[in-house]
Structure formats: C-alpha cells, structure tokens
Amino acid sequence: MALRCPIVSVLGHVDHGKTSLLDKIRRTRVTQREAGGITQHIGASEIPINTIKKVSKDLLGLFKADLSIPGILVIDTPGHEAFTSLRKRGGALADIAILVVDINEGFKPQTIEAINILKQCKTPFVVAANKVDRIPGWNSSEGPFILNFNEKNQHPNAMTEFEIRLYENVIKHLNELGFDADLFSRVKDTTKTINVVPVSAMTGEGIPDLLVIISGLAQKFLEQKLALNVEGYAKGTVLELKEEKGLGKTIDAIIYDGIAKTGDFLVVGNPDGVLVTKIKALLKPKELDEMRDPKDKFKPSKQISAATGVKISAPDLDNVIAGSPLRIVPKDQVDAAKEEVLQEVEEFTILTDDEGIIIKADTMGSLEALANELRKVKAKIKKAEVGDISKKEVIEASSYASTNPLNGLIISFNTKVLADAKVEIEKSDVKLLEGKIIYKLVEEYEDWIKEMEELLKSDEINRLTKPAMIKILPNCIFRQKEPAVCGVEVLYGTLKIGSPIMSEDGKKLGYVKEMRDNQQENIKEAKVGMQVPVSIDGNIVLSRNAKENDILYVEVPEPEARKLHHEFKDELRGDEKEALSRYMELKQKIENNIFWGM
C-alpha cells in the first residue's frame, strides 16, 4: 500500500524555538525574516525520507526502525495564543504534532492552549524539549541526543540538572494535564505515554531522534490515514496569494488529500462565494525549501499527490482569500466541489455587533484569529473584512465615532492603507492601529481603550459641577451686590468660575463670576485652603442674605451629585469627597429626602 507523507504540525509558546528547530532541519533561515520573531503564516516544508535516514542513520538500527513513508510535510503553525484559529486549522490538518517546550522555562499559557487544541483535534503529539544546550554544564553537540546522554560525555551534575528540568518543567506539567510522559528512550508503550525528545535548535542535538520518533509513530499508528488516495480529487487550503514574475497572481496551498493534475479545475473560496478556474501550472518547491520564501525557483509538475505544498498558477485569482478551502477536480466534478467549498467558506463568517470598531486582515485565518483575540478583551466589532483599508472604511469609522468615540478605530493586521485612506485619516478623528503581530495589536487596543476611557472620563468629570464649601472671610466684604465682591476661604472641594452658589438654608445666591489670586491675576479655580477674592453675580446681597463667616455651598444638581457619588468618587480628592458628602447631607435635610443624590 502506497503511503503519503504524514502532515506534521509544530506548536508551542512564542520564542520557545519552533521555527529555529525546523531551521536546523531545513538548513534555511526563515526565523530571522519573520515579524517579531514569530511565524505569522502557516508555512510548509517537505523533508524527504532520504534526508531523515541520512541524519538519523545511527539511530535507525538502535530503534529497529524501517521507515517506508516518503517523508514528512511540516506545517509551521504560529505559536502565540493569538493564532488559536490558525493553529486549530493547522492541528486539524495535521496527522501528528511536535509540541515545542523550552526545557528551562517550562509550560506557558500558549503551551497549555496548544495541548488543548491537539486534544480537541485528537492529534497525537511528541514533545520537543528544546534548549538543552542552556542547561548549566551540558555538553551539547550536533547529532543524536541518545548517544550524547551518558556520563562519558556529560558531567554528573549536568546529568542531574537535566533530569530535574526534564521532570519539573515538562513531564510534571504533562502529568497534571492527564498525560503519562517520559524521556523517549524510556517509553515502553507509545500508545499510552507521550514521548519527550530533548533537542537543541542551536546545536542540532536531538534532531535525528525527533525525526525518527515522529516518522516511526506516524507510520506505525497512522498507516490507514496515510494510505494515498490515488483516485480521489485533491483537497487543500490556500496559504497565500502571491504575485510571481511571468505567472501573475498565484496561490500557495497545502494539498492534504488526493491527486491534482495540470489542466484540472481549481474550485476555491473568494468574497463572492466560490471561484472556478482552469489550472495552468502546478509548481512545487524544491525539497527542503521553505514555501513562504524560497531561494530557488519552483519546478513544474504534471501531477501532484498529497500531502504536499504547491504553487498554483491559474487565471482570475485576484480575489482569492488566504485560508480558503480549495478543491482540484476534473470538469465533471466541479459542481460537487463547489458545494463542498461553499459550505466550508460559510463556516468562516465572523459575527459582528450592532456597534463597534472595524478590523481588517490579510487572510481569513488572521481575521478570525484577530477577532477571537479582541473578543477576549471584550471588544465590539462592527465590521470585519479581509483586504486593504480604503477611504470608505475611514468614513465609516468616523461616523461610528460620532455616536461613540470608542468606536472610531480601525485595526489593521498585515494589510495596506490605501493613499486616499491615509488622507482621510489625517483629517478625521479616526485612530488607526497597524501591525504584523496580533497579540501586540490587541495590547495596543487595550492601551488605546484605557487612554480613551480616561480621557472621556476626565472630560465628563470636567463637565460636572464640582462640589465645594466656602466661608465668607471677616472684614472682607468689598461690594454688597451686582456683583457682590468678598474674600472667601475654600474649606473643602474646588471652587470654579461659573459654579452656582447657595446658602446653608438652600437659597440660590448666584454664580461665581470672577476670582483672583494673590497677585491679582484672574484664575479659573481655587482649591482647598486657598483664600481668594470672588465676585458673585445674582440674588446675593452681602450683609443681608449672606454675612461674614457664613458657610456657602456650590449647588450641585442631583443627577450630577448622583454621578459623582456612584461613578466618579474614586476620581475625587479627599477634600472633594468631604465637600460632596456634606452637601448631600445638607440637601437630604433641606429636601426631607434621605435618598437625595443616592
């Protein structure tokens, strides 16, 4: 029975070394080209069986492994939790997975999340305990770990430290999550125990062991799943839409089942539903070359078989969305394939809110991941689309902001901002957040929301009437009325220009027209402890309805007093709280209503 390559997914926490580990196998340098050191798109690399046998020759006899699979196809799935959706897709597509864990740092939230995804997808996995070279005293060298793990090559203290870190940082956590696990060389029953393979992406130690374990497990337990479908049509997923010289727009895709031929029809999801177009060429990357950024040109193939990464050249691909499902079929099967693809596309619909922000991304998977992460921080999303940011979206966001300033935001993941949109943003009140790392965009969103909420709160507080108690100073009545001018001391709170003033018996006296400091300069407010001359315009007649040593209050309307008491109390100074408390007690007494302001 012919077997296809098992599809291998690599998951793990950010910076634990997923791409660097593959880098050691592929001999390329993908990691250094990725934004923020995080792999942002699902990539694919074929590792042929000859390469696996070559780097693992010392182990094949030791493990009595007879590998008959044609190789392995590695999907490099992003490791940060922001890419839950892409990882789910990667996990679901994968036959087996490598979970990368830093043996020195142990499990992180993203590690646990990755395990949960693998559980949901029922995908078997092996743990790569990376960075053994950083264990104090460890003598790490390229080649099999199992041949380096002995007292001849390692100091006893380093061996002890290795065992401690292996258990405390890896095995113990797996046990807590319900898995039996052990160092791969000690595993007796691979159906019940997780294999932990120590590796170093830096030196290459343990890479042969990892390849043998992955290949052997896939071949032993997934033989039926790996049986090549020699008659069925090809099924796959779009990774990226790319412009290629001499070819125009092309699709990079993973084919996970069936066979495709040049001249067949491509059925793929797009914004209008489904696109059907005739394939001009099927192009494959050279083995061990990374599809996202190949160093050499692709080679044409008349026929390809799963599992493989492929570049597809065909007409009318401009609007194809990355992450879309695809089928490659002969003409008589186009209608059936259209139904399948349409059904899958509909599953990608992102639910939107009646009000909220606009989010844009370069792929369906990224858009879904961005939306999911924003939902976790309680963001409301009015519009979510794949594609560049246009003037139309800026105008829409501006209209959203007119009803709620917190909605005047566009978040762009890995997309372009068109020229007319840039012009519109400059003259509008719309905020644009751009980035190539989703979790950082979410952090920026949270910072912006916090900043905006504080600004809006500050604006609202400033619009409210601030409470204050003042005392008319003796021998400081300078004018009796129209306006009355006298010296006052602020006992509690903040006295502002325009503040309405009332007496202790609740009579309206007027409002503060003017205040001056010791240098006779006009001021807008006076805080607790200040003694200032003020002019009060209104019904006040000094020495008649307001006298020396009288206590006067700033009159705060009940709705504003209630707001200050319930919503903004923490924003008030201690003396302002005291002024509000005394004022509310006075009003409750005057109005004969103990619930006044409550």
From Swiss-Prot:
GO CC terms, sorted: cytoplasm
Limits of the tr-type G domain: 3-225
Pfam families in UniProt: GTP_EFTU (PF00009), GTP_EFTU_D4 (PF14578), IF-2 (PF11987)
Sequence segments annotated as region (G3): 76-79
Region: G5, residue numbers: 200-202
Region (G2): 37-41
Sequence segments annotated as region (G4): 130-133
GO molecular function: GTP binding; GTPase activity; translation initiation factor activity
Region (G1): 12-19
Residues the record lists as binding GTP: 12-19, 76-80, 130-133
Superkingdom of this protein's organism: Archaea
UniProt keywords, alphabetically: GTP-binding, Initiation factor, Nucleotide-binding, Protein biosynthesis
HAMAP family: IF_2_A
Described function: Function in general translation initiation by promoting the binding of the formylmethionine-tRNA to ribosomes. Seems to function along with eIF-2.
Entry-linked PANTHER family: EUKARYOTIC TRANSLATION INITIATION FACTOR 5B, TRANSLATION INITIATION FACTOR IF-2-RELATED
Family note: Belongs to the TRAFAC class translation factor GTPase superfamily. Classic translation factor GTPase family. IF-2 subfamily.
Name of the protein this chain belongs to: Probable translation initiation factor IF-2
Species of provenance: Methanococcus maripaludis (strain C7 / ATCC BAA-1331)
Gene name linked to the record: infB
